[in-house]
Amino acid sequence: MRPRQRFRRFHPRWSKVNLRGFGGVGALKGVKALNGMNVRVSMRLKWISNRIHRIRRSRRLGRLSISVRPNGSWQVYLLSSLPLRSLSRVWGQFNRAHLPTFLRTPGFKLYAWVFGCNLSELKDPDLTHYRNFQDFFCRELRPETRPVDPVSPVVSPVDGRIVCQGVVDNNRIQHVKGLSYSLEALLGGISSSNPLVVNFEDEITPDLIQKHEQFAEQHSISLNSNNRYRKADASAAVVDEHSDEEALLCAFTDHPHFYLNDSRNSLNYFCPFSAFEDISNSVRSSCGKRLSPSSNFDLNNLGGDDDLRSESSSDFESAPASILEHEPTNWDDWVQEADVTDIDSLPWHNIRPGNKLFYSVIYLAPGDYHRFHSPADWVIESRRHFSGELFSVSPFLARRLHNLFVLNERVALLGRYEHGFMSMIPVGATNVGSIVINCDPTLSTNRLVLRKKSLGTFQEAVYKNASPVLDGMPVSRGEQVGGFQLGSTVVLVFEAPADFEFSTYQGQYVRVGEAL
């Protein structure tokens, strides 16, 4: 920081001095010299204080595993300076442009020849029915071309090449030799807000409930996960009707705090909505202003995570819970007061005895089938949308760019299956910002960002309305889940018995339904 900037940052105050009792001009010079020395000393002390603060903040961010800045060779920094998100949106407009009918067949055949697409697998072999390149990228295949392995508990969700796979060591995924990233950076931390609840078209009927119970029994999946990604339901707390505001605050702040991005310099305390469900109106009225939901904050009316919101929109921070003695005023205070031990309550930190966490990273080339399917018989409980960059995910760049998959825009699907925790993370890439989840119409990716989001932020939606007995959306192995365009990467992180061994190897090409 330059001296002039330090001077302006310190803001010294000058005061008038009565010179009648000091002997005139000589005394005036002495006073000016004294004030100048005080300014220099104060500026130096301020610089030391700022330096210590930055070091402490860096260490705390390292403990929270949310430092995901671009790091690599000079080519990486050059690439990070390009407007890749804007280029991807322009490319998306080009892909959606309708082609003349007479150009479709030769154009798609040329593309298939260049990128090695197998046109004999198309569900609709008539190329004139594909109006544009986007329709062709998201083409459907005949079901018999992708048989699902009947034995393996985990199968490939996509067509692609395995970049890396193995065991999660010390809560980190070893991407390539010397490059790794933490699960918190990839999947996020404790959800600190009451997330959006997705409504489904299927009506809850006794037949549907029975079907879901049979699904859980057949695949040995537990019922009602009780939202393992958040703190325990505060409605179980016993609260005296005549408790004062502070006592009631302590009763409910087992839930993580959250703040709204429309006021970055103030952190507001709210009692999560789930805590109000079983409380009488008289107790509600005693919550006070600090526990009352904001009047302009309605979770039920959120229209998805569209980035084209106004400045008063609500983006939720991922932050560990911590009962604070005072209200933090900014992000630095949150980092300082964060209780890192709350990270241990995340499901991937609480695996079953005798189990381990495994991962598999599969890269999709531009000519591959661009839809992703379910890797197992599991229940998708929630999804988290991380708005990020759109770097290329090619193996060439993946070997050179640190934290590639935690820098890029992605959607993390979290849930459970027979052996415990299961997650599938479709990762966006250059020209592939659009990610679609079939059961979630509220998801909107690669939208124009009017304001850069903070580190570790994500928008979360839960699927508990899909099933009252499973608290999520049940999907079977090989069932289509969603898709993206042109080429990207899918990361699997799942829990399995310690003796689990991959039947595939690094660099192998796999197809949907094949055993991993």
UniProtKB/Swiss-Prot annotation:
Residues recorded as bearing Pyruvic acid (Ser) in the entry: 488
Give the cofactor note text.
Answer: Binds 1 pyruvoyl group covalently per subunit.
Membrane listed as a keyword = yes
Q: What happens when the gene is disrupted?
A: Normal growth on non-fermentable carbon sources (ethanol and glycerol).
Which NCBIfam families does the UniProt record give?
PS_decarb (TIGR00163)
What does the sequence similarity comment in the record state about its family? Answer: Belongs to the phosphatidylserine decarboxylase family. PSD-B subfamily. Eukaryotic type I sub-subfamily.
Name of the protein in question: Phosphatidylserine decarboxylase proenzyme 2, mitochondrial
Native species: Schizosaccharomyces pombe (strain 972 / ATCC 24843) (Fission yeast)
- Record lineage: Eukaryota, Fungi, Dikarya, Ascomycota, Taphrinomycotina
